[in-house]
Amino acid sequence: MAFWQGLINWLGYGHEGEEPVMEKPVLEAETTPVTPAKGKLVGLPTARNAMRLVIARPQSFEQAAGLAENLKNYRPLIVNVEGIPVEEARRIIDFLSGAAYALGGRVRKVTSGIFLFTTSNVDLSGDLEDQIPGGLNWLEAAGRGR
């Protein structure tokens, strides 16, 4: 029986007690510190950076340049020119219309004497002009025509 046991052990199928285990030295891997790459931050709309609408009632043409600054900063602008002289109102509307056009925006009449100026970052839907009697001739609609 010793013969068969020896053969089984020699083939590797038997248990012969514990064999001496040779320990291999453990090698430590070199580690290099990894610095995380900076990701691109994208701002999400919040209440702080929400769009602001400026409402103004200019008294003279000298205020038109200050109002155009709002358009340059991509803020929509509502201007009420009721109650000021016709020529002064016409100059203000013409100046702000040019500023809005230069910025890729639009001009919409809200009521006679009140206009909405927008820039390219504002999308308007609807057709306000169709709802206002007098069409685009706001001076005649206000009773202040030439």
Swiss-Prot record:
GO terms for cellular component: cytoplasm. It comes from the Bacteria. It is found in: Cytoplasm. One of its GO terms (biological process) is FtsZ-dependent cytokinesis. Keywords: Cell cycle, Cell division, Cytoplasm, Septation. The keyword Cytoplasm applies. Gene3D superfamilies: SepF-like protein (3.30.110.150). Its main location: cytoplasm. Homodimer. Interacts with FtsZ. Belongs to the SepF family. Cell division protein that is part of the divisome complex and is recruited early to the Z-ring. Probably stimulates Z-ring formation, perhaps through the cross-linking of FtsZ protofilaments. Its function overlaps with FtsA. This is Cell division protein SepF. It comes from Moorella thermoacetica (strain ATCC 39073 / JCM 9320).
